[in-house]
Amino acid sequence: MDSQDCPCAAGGTCTCGDNCKCKNCKCTSCKKGCCSCCPAGCAKCAQGCVCKGPPSAKCSCCK
């Protein structure tokens, strides 16, 4: 499995799943959100977003 570095600090909630490739994810200000549906390069998604869902699926930020 790919290296996953997604430590969640107290006071924050992380959306990074077990199979996400988030590096140094700070939950209070997670800049590398793991989107399950947004296509790679989605300008509205967090930069460095690791997308695991099918390209046919779109989340609210991409609609």
Curated annotation (Swiss-Prot):
Residues 1-30 are annotated as: Beta. This is Metallothionein-1. A divalent metal cation 5 binds at residues 35, 37-38, 51. A divalent metal cation 3 binds at residues 16, 20, 25, 30. Residues 31-63 are annotated as: Alpha. A divalent metal cation 7 binds at residues 51, 59, 61-62. Metallothioneins have a high content of cysteine residues that bind various heavy metals. One of its GO terms (biological process) is cellular response to copper ion. A divalent metal cation 2 binds at residues 8, 14, 16, 27. Class I metallothioneins contain 2 metal-binding domains: four divalent ions are chelated within cluster A of the alpha domain and are coordinated via cysteinyl thiolate bridges to 11 cysteine ligands. Cluster B, the corresponding region within the beta domain, can ligate three divalent ions to 9 cysteines. A divalent metal cation 4 binds at residues 34-35, 45, 49. Coiled coil: none annotated. One of its GO terms (molecular function) is metal ion binding. Keywords: Metal-binding, Metal-thiolate cluster. It comes from the Eukaryota. PROSITE patterns: METALLOTHIONEIN_VRT. A divalent metal cation 1 binds at residues 6, 8, 22, 25. A divalent metal cation 6 binds at residues 38, 42, 45, 62. SUPFAM superfamilies: Metallothionein. One of its GO terms (cellular component) is nucleus. It comes from Columba livia (Rock dove). It holds the Pfam family Metallothio. The lineage of its organism: Eukaryota, Metazoa, Chordata, Craniata, Vertebrata.
